[in-house]
Amino acid sequence: KGNSGPGGGGTIPNLTFADVSVPEGNGGTGTVEIVLTLDHASSKPVTVNYSTVDGTAKAGADYTAVNGQLLTFQANETEKRIQITVVADDIREADETFMVRISNPVNVNLLKETCVVTLKNDDTKIGFANTGYDAPTSYPGYTLAWSDEFNGTSLSATDWSYESGDGCPGLCGWGNNELEYYTAPPNNLIFQDGKMIIEARAEAFGGKSYTSARIKTQGKRTFKYGRIDIRAILPTTKSLWPALWLLPQSNVYGNWPTSGEIDMMEEVGSEPAKVLGTAHYGPGPGSTFISRNYSLSGATFNDQFHVFSLEWQQDQIKWYVDNNLYSTVSKADVGSNIWPFNEQFFLIVNLAVGGNLPGAPDASSLFPQWLILDYIRVYQ
């Protein structure tokens, strides 16, 4: 596109520029520079206007907006530079983009109209709102039996172990067609500000396109009855599948699902205002289950912390969000099937990518994503 009129040598010059990628920085402001070049000089002034347009980067928060700014090449000038102010922060996030749109060409042809500016994230700190519901530190009739407040710089080897890989060869895709490779420390497990953070990334590793982490207390901490409180912030993007769940320490009644599975909390990342609580049981080979959900109104589980709880006693399990009861499952509900939940279980925390429940990532999926735990407390 261009404006008719003679240039140097009787031809109108072409305006060219390249997309730009710059480090965002971790404090204050910086500058991104876009070089605009004419393929030959013009005997007349050349003018264009330029404006910024939001992408995933937002004006005010990530850069300073420009609207309709005039840029002039004087006669025989062939290069000009546009400078846009970039607002830096120290928060780890996905790379972000905005556009600089060129318009109203006079005495010049535009070979393209838009420059894409990519702000490459180079930060290490993960941002989150340290607000939300906080559970009581005591309950009538219960005493604190075990807790992990995640105040250290690494996972307690006394309480936890890692599961790594993709489940192969015995349980490829972890039995759910998941797409991630779970790494051993320190790749995807981060400790910051008294929180444990599992980071899911879009990166090639172990033959997979995504990495994340999965930890368990198997053989180290087992639980039977009581109340479990877990305070967490959940991720929000299509294909993410965070889970807080329990499996039996011993398969007393046979292989899964006959010996049971208790899902304290599962979330489908594309539905960030809803969580699921589920009891899986036999007779197999597929699961028979009772599942119910809890939804927030006008908010998501990514906005701030919420507390996911189980109240577990002989022949009955109750599920809570922020101490609001939303599901009760009792022995009578499983009918003639075995009630497998009067045994010792261990805890698993993981952040899956893809799988049967959330589906695969698509163009709307943003990485990295985080499952952030403040504490786990077990009362008996």
Regions found by a protein language model. Name each.
Residues 109, 121-380:
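GH16 jelly-roll
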Residues 3, 82-83, 94, 103, ...:
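Small/flexible residues
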Residues 2, 8-127:
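Short boundary segments that mark the start of a structured unit
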Residues 1-2, 240:
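Intrinsically disordered, low-complexity segments used for protein-protein interactions
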